[in-house]
C-alpha cells in the first residue's frame, strides 16, 4: 500500500491525494491517507469519482485537530479491506463467543474494531464538531483558509529576517492552515515564548512529530550546524536548540486582524533582536 499525508503539518502544503490514489491503483497498491491535518481545512472526496481509480481506500484523522479535544481517532476504510485484517484491540463488544482456548471475532462493523467501553462523550463532541464544519461548508472553509494563508505568507515574505519553509507560491503548491518559519539568529523556542508571553499568540515550535522532514528542510538554513553535528558523530544532535521551527496555524475563528497582529509581533521581535 501507499501511505500519504493529506496536508503537511509542517508546511501546510496540500498533496493531490486523489491523483496519488490513481497512480497507486495503477500499480496495484492501496492508498491510505493521513488526514489529521486535512480534515478540518479541506473538502475530502473519498469516493464517487467518475474515474474510480481516484477513490481512496482508507483515510485516518484525529478528532483533536478537528475542534474536538478529547475525542477518538477515526478510521474510514473499505469494509472489504478491513474485514480481512484481525482487529488490533480485543475486548468487550468485538466478539461473538469466547471459549477457554479461543475467541470468535464478530463480523459486524464497526463493533469488531471498537473493543471495550467507547469514548461516548468524545464521540458526541467529534460528531458535533463535524456537523458544525458541515454546516459552514468545507468549500467555504478552504476558501477563507486559502485567503488567510496567502495574506500571511505575502506579509511574512516582506520581512527579510524571516525564513519560510516550503514552497511559498500557492499556485505551485496550494497550502492551507499552516506556515512554519524561523527568524535568523534566533532560537525557535525563544521566538515561540516571546510570541506567547508578550503578544498572546499561541504557536507550536520544535519538530512537530515530523523529525526527518524538519531535519531535511533545516538543511536549507542550518547546513553548517548539521554538518558539524554529523562530523562529531553526535547521536542526539536533533536535541540541539537550533533543531526546530516555529509553526503558526489558522482556524475557522481567525481573521486578517489576527495576521496583522502576528506580523507586527514578528517585526517587533526583530527590531529588538540586538
PLM region descriptions:
Residues 1-274:
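Pyridoxal 5′-phosphate
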